[in-house]
Amino acid sequence: MSPLETNPLSPETAMREPAETSTTEEQASTPHAADEKKILSDLSAPSSTTATPADKEHRPKSSSSNNAVSVNEVDALIAHLPEDERQVLKTQLEEIKVNISFFGLWRYATKMDILIMVISTICAIAAGAALPLFTILFGSLASTFQRIMLYQISYDEFYDELTKNVLYFVYLGIGEFVTVYVSTVGFIYTGEHATQKIREYYLESILRQNIGYFDKLGAGEVTTRITADTNLIQDGISEKVGLTLTALATFVTAFIIAYVKYWKLALICSSTIVALVLTMGGGSQFIIKYSKKSLDSYGAGGTVAEEVISSIRNATAFGTQDKLAKQYEVHLDEAEKWGTKNQIVMGFMIGAMFGLMYSNYGLGFWMGSRFLVDGAVDVGDILTVLMAILIGSFSLGNVSPNAQAFTNAVAAAAKIFGTIDRQSPLDPYSNEGKTLDHFEGHIELRNVKHIYPSRPEVTVMEDVSLSMPAGKTTALVGPSGSGKSTVVGLVERFYMPVRGTVLLDGHDIKDLNLRWLRQQISLVSQEPVLFGTTIYKNIRHGLIGTKYENESEDKVRELIENAAKMANAHDFITALPEGYETNVGQRGFLLSGGQKQRIAIARAVVSDPKILLLDEATSALDTKSEGVVQAALERAAEGRTTIVIAHRLSTIKTAHNIVVLVNGKIAEQGTHDELVDRGGAYRKLVEAQRINEQKEADALEDADAEDLTNADIAKIKTASSASSDLDGKPTTIDRTGTHKSVSSAILSKRPPETTPKYSLWTLLKFVASFNRPEIPYMLIGLVFSVLAGGGQPTQAVLYAKAISTLSLPESQYSKLRHDADFWSLMFFVVGIIQFITQSTNGAAFAVCSERLIRRARSTAFRTILRQDIAFFDKEENSTGALTSFLSTETKHLSGVSGVTLGTILMTSTTLGAAIIIALAIGWKLALVCISVVPVLLACGFYRFYMLAQFQSRSKLAYEGSANFACEATSSIRTVASLTRERDVWEIYHAQLDAQGRTSLISVLRSSLLYASSQALVFFCVALGFWYGGTLLGHHEYDIFRFFVCFSEILFGAQSAGTVFSFAPDMGKAKNAAAEFRRLFDRKPQIDNWSEEGEKLETVEGEIEFRNVHFRYPTRPEQPVLRGLDLTVKPGQYVALVGPSGCGKSTTIALLERFYDAIAGSILVDGKDISKLNINSYRSFLSLVSQEPTLYQGTIKENILLGIVEDDVPEEFLIKACKDANIYDFIMSLPEGFNTVVGSKGGMLSGGQKQRVAIARALLRDPKILLLDEATSALDSESEKVVQAALDAAARGRTTIAVAHRLSTIQKADVIYVFDQGKIVESGTHSELVQKKGRYYELVNLQSLGKGH
C-alpha cells in the first residue's frame, strides 16, 4: 500500500483528490498553513490533505510503480463502502489477465493472411522434407558404391545409376529454392501484417479506456508496449516460424523414412526424443517466467526514462543527470538479473539437447551392429536409418534458437492482449446511449459523491448538489484540492460518480451516448496540449464529430480563422512565417504558453459548443492577452452553459453564479457582489489577490477598481495587432562587429542531411567496447564455442568409421562387434562433451549479452542527458522517439553478442574443421565441394546487407508511428475531450500501412538470396556425389575416404547456411550500433559533462545582458530577442513582465545557458557565462518553473535532487521545506518525507508539487534564483503563502522573476517590461504606474474591484 493510503476516516485523509491531468489546476494543496486556516476560518470544515494522481495533460502512471493500487488492495480499501459504490470503483480499475497460446498470436489474421500462411506452411514443410529424401538416394547410392568396389557391375552401368541419382538431387535443389522463397516471403509478410493489426488494436483499445485506467499506467509503458513488445511479437511470428516448420518437417520426414526402413532400430533411436521434449518443455517454463520479469523491469525503467527526458530542462538546470541516471539503472540491474537467468537456462537446454542427440547416434549405431550380426537387416538399411535419424535430430537442433523468440512473443502478447480484451466502462467508441435532438445545456449535480478509482480510500466530493443553468456562467473557486476539477471530470464523464447523478437537461448523463456528450462540450485546460502538427489542424481538431466536420474547406478555414480571432490568436499566427501552416512541435513546445493557450481556446470555440468548460483557461496568459482573451471568452460564453474554474478571481467577477468549494463541499454561492458583501471565504480570497495600490491612489484615481470598457478592449486589440505586425517583417540583425558563436552558427542552419557512415569493423569494435569488463567471460564463451563447433566434424569421422565398420564381411563379425562397441562409446563421450561445451558457452555469453544491453542502455541514457536543450527541441528527438530508441535499439545490439555470436563462431569452427579434415583425407573431392562454399557465404552476406538496409528504412516509419501513438496516449484527456480517438487511430493506421508497403519490396529481394543459399546445399551434394562417385568408380577412393569428405562438407555447408538465418538479428544489430555510435559521437554545443571553462568559487549575483540577439535553433526564421540590454545588481529582486512570446522565459533559458546567444553577451559578475565551467556556474543558480517537475520516488528523494551530494544534514532539508511552506503538509502525511509522490508527482496537487519544487530549489542555497511563473499553478491562498516564502528566500540573493500576476512582483526592486524581444520600460511598481505607460495598462487590467 502506498504511504499516502491511510485510514480513510482520519481528518488528514478526509479528502484527497486524484487530480485531473489536463485540468491540473489544484491537484490538491493542503490548507495546513496558518494563513490558509485564517482565510477559511469561517468554515468549520476539517483541515484536509488532498493528494491527486495525475498531472498536467495526462501522463499515465506506471503500473510497476509504488503508487499503483493492486486489485486486492482496492478491495481492502473500499471494504467500508456499500456494494454499489464498490462496484463503480472496481469497474473503472479492473484489469484483464489473459493466457495466450502461441497460435493466439494470429488472432487478427485476415482470410488472405491465413491463405498465405497455409501456402507458406505447405512450402516450409516441403522445403523441410527435401533433405531426408536424400537419405533414400543415399541408401541407393551406397549399395551402388559397394557393388562397384566389389566389381559386381561395370563402370558404364555404375555411371548411369550415379547420373540418375545425382539428377534427383538437382531436382530437389530446385524444389527447395521455390519452397524456401515462398515460405520466407509469406511468413515475413503475414508476420508484419498480423503485428500491424495488433499495434492497431492495441492503440484502439488504449484510446477507448476510461481515464481511471490511465491513472495507474506508466507513460513509458504504452510506448514500450507499442514498440519493443510488438517487435518481440513480430520477431516470433515472422521468418522464424518458417525456419522452425522446415526444421520440424525435416525431423518428421526423416523419422518416417527411418521407421519404414527398419522400425525396431528407429524405435530404439526414438527413445531419446522423449527426453528431448521433456528437456525443452521444462526449460521453456523457466524461460517464460524469467523473460516476463525482465520485460517488467524494462517497462518500469522506460517510465523513469520517459519522466526524465520529458522534463530535461529541469534535470539540466539542477545538474541531477547522474542521480536520475542511477534511478534508471536500478531497473536495468533488475532486468539484467532476470535476463541472465533466462539466457543461462536457454544455454543448458540447448546443451542437454545436443548431448542427447549424440548419445542417440551411439545407441543407434550400437544396436544396428547387433541387428546386422543377427542378420535382421542389411548395411544399406542401417545406413538409411542412421542417416535419417542423424538429419532429423540435427534439424531439431535448429528449432531451439527460435524457441526463445516464440516464448518472448507469447510473454509480450499476454500484456498487450490483456489491454485489448479489457471492456472499458466508459467507451467513447460505443454507440450505446441516447442522443438529444435538442437540448438547452442545463447541468445539475444531484447528491454527488465521488471517489477517484486510483485513490479509493479518499472521498473527494460528498453529497454535492449544484445547479448550473443553461446559457449562464457558473464559476468554481476554492483552495487547491477542493473538488473544482472534479466537477469538470464528472461533466466530461472522465469518471463515474460513486453515488448521485449528473444531469443534462434532466437526463442522467450515463444514459446519454458518451461520444455525443463529449462532442457537445468544449474543454480548455490550464496546461493545454497541442498535437505535433500545424496550427490549422490543431484548431480543426475542435470540429471532429460536430455538424461542421464535413463542411467545405473554405467554410472550415473561415470557421478556424474566426475562432482564432475570437481567441486573440489570429494576429500572432499570421505574423509567423508559415502562418496557420506552422508546425507547433511535440505537445506544442515551439510556442509560448500564452500562444498555446490561445490556440487551445480557438480549438474549443471553433465548433460553437453548447457547453464550455474553462479550467483556468487564462492562467498561462500574460495580463494583456488575458484581458482580451477574457473578454473574448465572456463573449463566447454568451448563450451557452459555461463552467469556469479560476484561481485569478478577476477573471470570474461577471459570472452569474460563483460557487466556493472547500473540502469537497459547497461553502457558499452567489454573485461576486453578493459574496463580497457577505464577507465570507470568497471576500477573503478576493482580498488576498487585490493589488496593493494605496501608495498610487492619486495616480490611479480614475482607474482604481475599474474594469475594461469595450472601448479599452478595442484600443488594446488595435495596439496588440499593430505590435504583432512587426513580427511579420523580416528583422535584419546587423552583425557587424559582433562575433556569432559557433553554436548559434551551426544551430541557426537546418540539421544537415548527411549522417556519418561507419564500416562494419568500426561498429563491431564499438559494440565490443561495451563488453570490455566481460573479456574473461567472452574468452570462456569463445573457447567453448570452438569446442562445441568441433562436435560435428568429429561426428562425421565417427560416422564414416561406422559405415566402414558395418561394411566388414561376415568373416570379421567379431572385429565388427568390438569396433562397434568402441565407436558407440565415442559417440556417447562426444555427447557429454557437447553438453558441457554448449551449456558453458550459453552461460558465458548470457552474462556478456545481458551486461552489454544494460551498459548500452545506461550509457545511451547518460549520453542523452548530456545533450544540450537544442537537441531535444528537434522533432526526431521527441520524448517518445528517445524512449523508444532506449527500449528497442539496445535490444537489437545483442544481435552481435550472446547466442548469435556463439552460434556464428561455432558454425565457423564446424566449417573450418570440416574443410581441414576433408582436405587431409581426400583433397580432390574436398576441393570440388569447397568450391561451392564461397558462393554460399556470398549469398548469406548479401542477405545480411539487404536486411540492414531494410532495417534502417523500417525503423524510421515505426519510430514515427510509435512517437505519434505515444503523443496521443500521453495526452489522453485532450484526445478524449475532443473525441479524436478515431482520427488518431486512422492516422496511425495510415502510417503503418505505408511502412508495410515499403518493407515488402525489400523482403522480396532479400528472401531471393536466402532461398538461393539454402538450395545451393543440394547442388553442392549433387556435385559431391557425382565427382566422388567418379573417383570411387575409378577405384581412386575407398568408401571411408569418400564418406569422410562428403559428410564433412555436406554438414559444414549446411552450417554455413544456418549462420545466415541470424542475418536479420545481425542486420538489426548493425543498424542499432550505427545509431548508438551516432549518438555517442554527437558532441553537444553546450556540454553538461565538460570540465572546461573557469570554475567559480563564489558569485555575487550581478547579471548583465549586452545587446543580446537570439532565435531558437528549431525556428531560425523567428527572432525572439532583438538586442536585449538588461542589468541586475547583486541581491536585487528583478521582475520581467510583458505579453506572451516576448522573450521573458527565453531570458531565463539563456541565463541557465540552455542555449547560447546568437550575438551579444551575457555576463555574471562581469564574466561571460559562455567562458565559465557549465556545472560550476549552474551550481549557483536555482530554477523554479511554471510546471513543477517531480519524479517517481519519495518527497525526500525529490527534494534532494536539488543538490549533487547524496547526504545533506536533516536541518538543511527541514529549513528548505519550511521556507517553501511545505513542511507542515509533509509532516501531516502518515509517511512524512518518505511519502511516494507517484509518476511525475501525480499523487500531489499542483500547489503541493510546486512547493516541493521550491524546496528543492532553496536546498541549493543559490546565489541567483530564477522564478519562471513559479506561483501560476497555485490558488490564491497557496500563492500568498508561497509568495511570502519566495520573498523571504529572495533576500540576500539575486532573484529574477517572470510573472503574469502582477500582485506577485509589486515589491520588486526593478520591473522590466518586455515587448517584441526588447525592454520598453523599467522601474519600480510605483514609478511605472505613475508613468501611465505599458505597465500601467497591465495593472489596470488586473485590478480586482467589485463588479461592473
UniProtKB/Swiss-Prot annotation:
Name of the molecule in the record: ABC multidrug transporter atrD
Ranges of compositional bias, category Polar residues: 1-10
Region (Disordered): 1-67
Reported induction: Expression is strongly increased in the presence of cycloheximide, camptothecin, imazalil, itraconazole, hygromycin and 4-nitroquinoline oxide (4-NQO).
Species of origin: Emericella nidulans
Molecular-function GO terms, alphabetical: ABC-type oligopeptide transporter activity; ATP binding; ATP hydrolysis activity
Domain of life: Eukaryota
Gene name linked to the record: atrD
Subcellular location: Cell membrane
Disruption phenotype: Leads to the cellular accumulation of fenarimol. Leads to increased susceptibility to cycloheximide, the cyclosporin derivative PSC 833, nigericin and valinomycin.
